Amino acid sequence: MKNSKKSLMHVLSMSILLSLSSTSFAELVNNPSSGNSGTASLNWSSADASQFLNDEDDEPTPQGSTSVTTTLRGGSAPKIVASAPKIAPIRDTSGYNAQPSVSARAALVMDAQTGEVLYSKNTNASVPIASITKLMTAVVTADARLNMSEEITLEQIDFAGANGKNSSSTLRVGDKMNRAEVLLFALMKSENPAAAALARTYPGGRPAFVAAMNAKARALGMNATHYYESTGLDPRNVSSARDLGILVSTASQYGLIRQFSTTPTYDFNLGYRVLKSNNTNALVRNGGWNINLSKTGYINEAGRCVVMHTTVNSRPAVIVLLGEPSTQARNNDATNLLGWLSNLPKRI
């Protein structure tokens, strides 16, 4: 199990990605074993990181009501990378003794290498997934091989929300950052304007981006999944625990998604202000578990959700919890499942 010190060093190594050229960045996305060194373009201190590591940050709370419009940009959409996840077909072997009970509406624990379902609860139910949506947003963004150094300016439309909902945000209209920083905001801090901006600046705009999300889901065999937008605010964004197990296994193959989604804390230097930002998953912030990928989600219709790719006793595993009644219940269930995994026979 890794400790919080290792997690903080993980952030230092991650920050250099933000200053990479588009070519080296694209190579890193699909070649997680490659290494780079240099000076980070965003600065933060270990003392600041320690101060914010245990804060109870969670998903931005949906609030208010706005009308939704979209902006269609010219250009053709990039070719969708439709490779299947490198896991065995999912098969249910959940007859283990002393399985923990969870409060989640749906749950899955899967061996990410063999595809064995170690724990299951309503795994085929199609339910709202809130900001777990942003994991597919990240995959589509990475597949597009766009210039990650390109500057993006947040526009009012990025704050418009979806389906009559918007959410609180520390970002502002007019904030400027490169595409890598936008992706980091979307994964680590679950900022909805960041996810909206990634869709808006995709070739073909939001309609092409959402089409790519659904095409990727179909290509991966996520048959209970459908996306209407890129943030997760729309409760019509639905999936199943089974489908999300496939998505997490796929997303874990992208080095950048792994690093950005498991960054515990980060200072975003926007030039005229610095945003101290924390990961929305307390298990990532607090350390102690070997979590390789993480994404949380919340809207009223979805409840509290989390997906993780972890390694326990040399076993790569996926954990999915959907529809938890509270953040505390979500964290407790995730911790209990991780502990239960650690007591299973070790992989040889």
Label each residue range with its predicted role.
Residues 1-13:
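Bacterial Sec-dependent N-terminal signal peptides
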Residues 222-226, 232-348:
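Domain-terminus/edge residues, biased toward the C-terminal soluble/receptor-binding domains
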